[in-house]
Amino acid sequence: MLSVGRGIADITGEAADCGMLGYGKSDQRTAGIHQRLRSRAFVFRDDSQDGDARLLLIVAELPLPMQNVNEEVLRRLADLYGDTYSEQNTLITATHTHAGPGGYCGYLLYNLTTSGFRPATFAAIVDGIVESVEHAHADVAPAEVSLSHGELYGASINRSPSAFDRNPPADKAFFPKRVDPHTTLVRIDRGEATVGVIHFFATHGTSMTNRNHLISGDNKGFAAYHWERTVGGADYLAGQPDFIAAFAQTNPGDMSPNVDGPLSPEAPPDREFDNTRRTGLCQFEDAFTQLSGATPIGAGIDARFTYVDLGSVLVRGEYTPDGEERRTGRPMFGAGAMAGTDEGPGFHGFRQGRNPFWDRLSRAMYRLARPTAAAQAPKGIVMPARLPNRIHPFVQEIVPVQLVRIGRLYLIGIPGEPTIVAGLRLRRMVASIVGADLADVLCVGYTNAYIHYVTTPEEYLEQRYEGGSTLFGRWELCALMQTVAELAEAMRDGRPVTLGRRPRPTRELSWVRGAPADAGSFGAVIAEPSATYRPGQAVEAVFVSALPNNDLRRGGTYLEVVRREGASWVRIADDGDWATSFRWQRQGRAGSHVSIRWDVPGDTTPGQYRIVHHGTARDRNGMLTAFSATTREFTVV
């Protein structure tokens, strides 16, 4: 018998002038909110086991998981609950949206486009994750947990088919359309009510382009919002909803949601929002359909966790394609990584695949450094990350690997972006060791930390973006397979595993310039709505405001759409809603304007409405003053 607790909380960081994380573009900085980012936590407790056996699963709408975030979350949870939640039984996975603020990372590389570490965004993420766990911890109660699987086509496409085609026929035959359609739904019921779901599917969080400046949970964020808010009627500002839906990743390293190809800069501005909604709806519909086919997940929970120095693993021949003993190498970025992807181009002068200049340089280096050649060739090396790592933590080398079990479901926690065939090999290996059905074993990427990509040794040879971003060389996947096999064998045999050596503490660097004191007639409405609107039209208003970063309003909102009901005004939308957008623009050196848009939904009740803006101004002494402003009334007919 399992008991389950659920919790949700806001983790939205700085909505103004903060570098966004995902595409690696320094000029892609936050300038508002389309949808808020959220953490969803699930506590599973096995009531049939002695003691207090628990598993904590957190799905966070973040670009990347980070070691320093995990460490601070676990430190805070230890202050609250002692040793109830630990590295071993806590799995934190990111949805990999490319539309979230960055600067929260402990390793310098990921903060280069954000002017370094951003304490406010880091705090919002940690505070929100911890809050979601607090809600889940308090919510634990007996539940019926069931499991189902499906197939979803039309929500992903292989963005590196030439690399995929290098795999052996047996692997390619498993994915005849070059995509991984496998979906999994964990359903949580209490009595007659479904109170929570966790859906797993492989597709990238790149429906929003690198030209977007609004915070968004991308397609998985929309899927969760649609089920909770649109279908379930959740009011996130009023407390914990009765139903919580998390949409998690599996192995989407080479999976793109842009099934019609990347959007060109000339595409209509609303196209990326349409793509986000469409791919999110596909995932929601798949999950909703599976509700009727779920069967009991089974008894028991278990977890194994270890750290591995991924740059110095001696891999036994049983885990390599040719049966030969191999060794991984220290992290190095290839020219293919610098090129970026078709949907997010990188630096000028680089291309995916072969780069003759860098290939020639690397061949010369390989002749002088045979161990490096054995690990990294044919990568055209552009940046050996080991060198900056000696000066300051730049990328992570000692990484966490995890295996957890909920009933008959096994989750392999990988701290990177596995391609679909890399994930398949990990799944097959665990399934064979523990005696599980392959469908019940998932490779969950973006878990607990981040090491970039995980390709198969065959895909690596193509040196597309994914291969160039497989930092530890051609045998990285093989090293992870060896480590995961040890965890699976220990779980099967009921043995503990050694934790291994933890990564050294990171040191945050920041060169963010302090913002000037705000100036202006705060709250003045400089563009009022029209008098009358119909469903399908857009209401817009512009306010004199202040820097949104003065108060992130975590758990709150920068805007409200309110409707007159008798003598009162009732909130019917906020800045977390799909129908609203909140845009910030700097005016001069210290001024701010905020534009608020509400796309009137088709089912909107006719009546009198207003738009309300909430802001906070900071003076020269650092004193904060909250203000609110309201438009004139307008009518929806």
UniProtKB/Swiss-Prot annotation:
* Family per similarity comment: Belongs to the neutral ceramidase family.
Q: How does activity depend on temperature?
A: 10 minutes at 100 degrees Celsius abolishes completely the activity.
Q: Which GO terms describe its cellular component?
A: extracellular region; membrane; peptidoglycan-based cell wall
Q: Which organism is it from?
A: Mycobacterium tuberculosis (strain ATCC 25618 / H37Rv)
- InterPro entries reported in the protein's UniProt record: Ceramidase_alk (IPR006823), Ceramidase_neut_Mycobact (IPR048153), NCDase_C_sf (IPR038445), NEUT/ALK_ceramidase_C (IPR031331), NEUT/ALK_ceramidase_N (IPR031329)
- State its cofactor: Zn(2+); Mg(2+)
User: Where, by residue number, is the active site?
Assistant: 256
Any single GO molecular-function term of the entry would be: metal ion binding
Give me the segments passing through the membrane. Answer: none
The EC number(s) this enzyme carries? 3.5.1.23
Does Magnesium show up as a keyword for this record?
Answer: yes
Name a biological process GO annotation. long-chain fatty acid biosynthetic process
Per UniProt, activity regulation is: 90% of activity is inhibited by nickel, zinc and calcium ions. Magnesium, cobalt, copper and manganese ions inhibit between 50 and 80% of activity.
Annotated residues that bind Mg(2+) are located at 34, 575, 577, 580
Task: Quote the catalytic activity from the record.
Answer: an N-acylsphing-4-enine + H2O = sphing-4-enine + a fatty acid; an N-acylsphinganine + H2O = sphinganine + a fatty acid; an N-acyl-(4R)-4-hydroxysphinganine + H2O = (4R)-hydroxysphinganine + a fatty acid; N-(9Z-octadecenoyl)-sphing-4-enine + H2O = sphing-4-enine + (9Z)-octadecenoate
**What functional role does this protein have?**
Catalyzes the cleavage of the N-acyl linkage of the ceramides (Cers) to yield sphingosine (Sph) and free fatty acid. Also catalyzes the synthesis of Cers from Sph and fatty acid. Cers containning C6-C24 fatty acids are well hydrolyzed, and Cers with mono unsaturated fatty acids are much more hydrolyzed than those with saturated fatty acids.
**Positions of Zn(2+) binding:** 96, 204, 417, 453
Note on cofactor: Binds 1 zinc ion per subunit.
Q: Pfam families, per this entry?
A: Ceramidase_alk, Ceramidse_alk_C
Report keywords, A-Z.
Hydrolase, Lipid metabolism, Magnesium, Metal-binding, Zinc
User: NCBIfam families in the record, alphabetically?
Assistant: ceramidase_neut
Q: Does the keyword Cytoplasm apply?
A: no
Q: How does activity shift as pH rises or falls?
A: Optimum pH is between 8 and 9.
* Lineage, top ranks: Bacteria, Bacillati, Actinomycetota, Actinomycetes, Mycobacteriales
Designated name of the protein: Neutral ceramidase
